[in-house]
């Protein structure tokens, strides 16, 4: 029964991890640089399932090491190498998640395939450093029976503690602290919302709004925004509107449509407003009014033939005192809003992926903790804390 279960787990491990590698290498949506961690992790798990578990199963079923003595030493080194690499890969993935959540825009620009491959190389080097000592220093293995030879891990206390700390306890502690930090960042980000991030809603709420019926200081000056008020008054040319009389008479009839409240009020004649030269551009009028002052001109008989087309309000922008200020405000707000939404989407994606990895790592820690705890306990107090062989 045990052999059947272990055999099924071996096949399931090989098939499942092969699908992971195939999906990352063939799917366009999964070709992100950080998914190289998953490819390397899946490769380590496949090596464990093909080179380690079958020989461990045979050793447990037979009760002794049936294969060559040299292969026993290589087998033990590969066992430590692949298992340590698998654990350290999960630690590297957790650090990658933390940097992606805490510094999303900055880290994503630096998360290149070359950098990820370099981190993967460091992971394998760490695993190799931990697994090589048993090959170099074999220690006191004791007498080996000729009929039933054994293949056991290094029983030196210093190596047991060092390998347990480097292979499991240190990466496990790092992963727990990192995912706790990610949880706190995600929770704080969720509680703040767009206003705490300086989102577009907050910036728009701080913009001044003109009071209906009151002429603002900016409207009293011959600025460019005043030329946006009505199409006919652009470029210094006025056109009569329905229900509106000439100068000196009642300005508007009761049925005349009013200007939108967000548009600056237009000063009437006699309030210090000067009309620019008809047919000139808004920039030229502004420069002439600032330097020389624009003298009043008589209106032409045919406004339609003399006046240039009226300026249109940019879509999605706010009207302020000047046209230049209006354009800059609209573009700045849109850019800030796009950055905020891009960061929000990135954080949401990272948080979902982080949750899945947290579940995987939690199950992984629960599976590995009993072995490393009992393995380390045998080195700390070998006489009084001896773990039964069957439980180990």
Swiss-Prot record:
Cited CDD domains: 7tmA_alpha2B_AR
The taxonomy runs: Eukaryota, Metazoa, Chordata, Craniata, Vertebrata
Keywords carried by this UniProt record: Cell membrane, Disulfide bond, G-protein coupled receptor, Membrane, Receptor, Transducer, Transmembrane, Transmembrane helix
Gene field: ADRA2B
Question: According to the UniProt record, which cysteines are disulfide-bonded?
Answer: 72-151
Whether Cell division counts among this entry's keywords is no
* Compositionally biased region (Low complexity): 296-315
Renumbered to this chain, the Acidic residues biased-composition regions fall at 282-294
Bilayer-crossing residues are 1-25, 37-62, 73-95, 118-140, 157-180, 357-380
- Give ranges for the Extracellular compartment: 63-72, 141-156, 381-392
Official protein name in the record:
Alpha-2B adrenergic receptor
